[in-house]
Amino acid sequence: MPDQALQQMLDRSCWVCFATDEDDRTAEWVRPCRCRGSTKWVHQACLQRWVDEKQRGNSTARVACPQCNAEYLIVFPKLGPVVYVLDLADRLISKACPFAAAGIMVGSIYWTAVTYGAVTVMQVVGHKEGLDVMERADPLFLLIGLPTIPVMLILGKMIRWEDYVLRLWRKYSNKLQILNSIFPGIGCPVPRIPAEANPLADHVSATRILCGALVFPTIATIVGKLMFSSVNSNLQRTILGGIAFVAIKGAFKVYFKQQQYLRQAHRKILNYPEQEEA
Amino acid sequence: MPDQALQQMLDRSCWVCFATDEDDRTAEWVRPCRCRGSTKWVHQACLQRWVDEKQRGNSTARVACPQCNAEYLIVFPKLGPVVYVLDLADRLISKACPFAAAGIMVGSIYWTAVTYGAVTVMQVVGHKEGLDVMERADPLFLLIGLPTIPVMLILGKMIRWEDYVLRLWRKYSNKLQILNSIFPGIGCPVPRIPAEANPLADHVSATRILCGALVFPTIATIVGKLMFSSVNSNLQRTILGGIAFVAIKGAFKVYFKQQQYLRQAHRKILNYPEQEEA
């Protein structure tokens, strides 16, 4: 070994703890990167701690010398076959579990939809008849058909036919003079066109659609019993109740929105009170 | 009206469209705030549009004069009783729906937990016996008892007894020389204490707990059938299978974590290859 390299070896010092050979003869040294001079040598133990800090618990993270940017060559003892298999299984489970958990959530919502569908069938057609229908039906048809009930209700609820009726109403309102007698002020022109009202915050309108759709069969059954008690068939009575409810609610909604529209249109901004000026 | 005020009225101009009285004799004027001079007067119609813009669809938002900061006095036609009731109902529904939707979600998870509990009872105790037990049980007890099954499984899964065993192992490993023969290298001291490994990302560990807990009864049943087929009682067989599975899995896990620990402890950082230096 040339004298110069030997000399360098003898007066090396660790760039982590600054100790030299005299301070600790037994310590193991390593030159992990391309650096020369005072940052060439470092204790193996000191460097390990330094790398631990840099990795912050992620033992597979790569670490490089902050000065010459050379990546440290970190090697581990070979994995035994058992540990290799366990490691593989561990990583597979970690990868699969988020998807399995998502599957559980979807399964939970699906199962609730099936149950809701079954309850709705019994509610609309009648308890006993509903059970008979479902017992006779093909299980596969049930597992697909029942959850479509809430889906259909939600999609149906998303159809905003009232807004369509409102647009027609405003478009042809001046031709609707005859309606003026029933709904006063229905046909007269508005002094100004108010700004389009903000639609409800997304989450509120989404929850309104969900709740409105899921409670609809119950309301249809109640309205059916109240208004069409003379109709014997549960199904027909509930369907009539549903149609009546949609129509009545729609009429109220159209009227309400039109009144809000008119209210906005007839909004007034007053003069600032005189006396406050003096 | 004093001459000066009259004169001001005559040469007023709208600070939105800059039109004066001559440009539009019929336009309605308003002085909505404390401003004087050229920004005192404005057309009612122009100010309405300006306010619409400021409100961006939120018709109840308050608007103030950008200069004197006086709030505009915006008044609406009085609400009719029907519209008042409809408005009230509309706002109530908007407030209640988010909570109702949250209730539906919780109900969905609860209902899935009840179903999972029932399926697990039938799986562990046996299909027919499970049904008998549940038919004889008090419905209220079922509606509370069944969902606690998945809850108990999840809580049980969160007990990390393997880590406790590991800590004991590392604490008294040097006294465990006798184990050295079974698990080579189990007792010998480690060259360094590796950094604590990062726990799994929260969502991964949460999903692992959820999936591990919910799949446990199925695994316990299978292990029970494989290892304790001589045991007649379904329940006992499944319990034995569960205990065996937990013990075996725990042993593997402790061994695996200890091997990872040792692997980290015997990690080495090599010298940077010489030839690359020249």
UniProtKB/Swiss-Prot annotation, chains A, B:
Reactions it catalyzes: S-ubiquitinyl-[E2 ubiquitin-conjugating enzyme]-L-cysteine + [acceptor protein]-L-lysine = [E2 ubiquitin-conjugating enzyme]-L-cysteine + N(6)-ubiquitinyl-[acceptor protein]-L-lysine
UniProt GO BP: negative regulation of cytoplasmic pattern recognition receptor signaling pathway; positive regulation of cGAS/STING signaling pathway; positive regulation of mitochondrial fission; positive regulation of NLRP3 inflammasome complex assembly; protein autoubiquitination; protein K27-linked ubiquitination; protein K48-linked ubiquitination; protein K63-linked ubiquitination
Cross-referenced InterPro entries: Znf_RING-CH, Znf_RING/FYVE/PHD
Keywords: Endoplasmic reticulum, Membrane, Metal-binding, Mitochondrion, Mitochondrion outer membrane, Peroxisome, Transferase, Transmembrane, Transmembrane helix, Ubl conjugation, Ubl conjugation pathway, Zinc, Zinc-finger
Cellular-component GO terms for this entry: endoplasmic reticulum; endoplasmic reticulum membrane; membrane; mitochondrial outer membrane; mitochondrion
Expressed in which tissues: Expressed in brain, heart, liver, lung, spleen, stomach, testis, skeletal and muscle.
Protein name: E3 ubiquitin-protein ligase MARCHF5
Annotated gene: MARCHF5
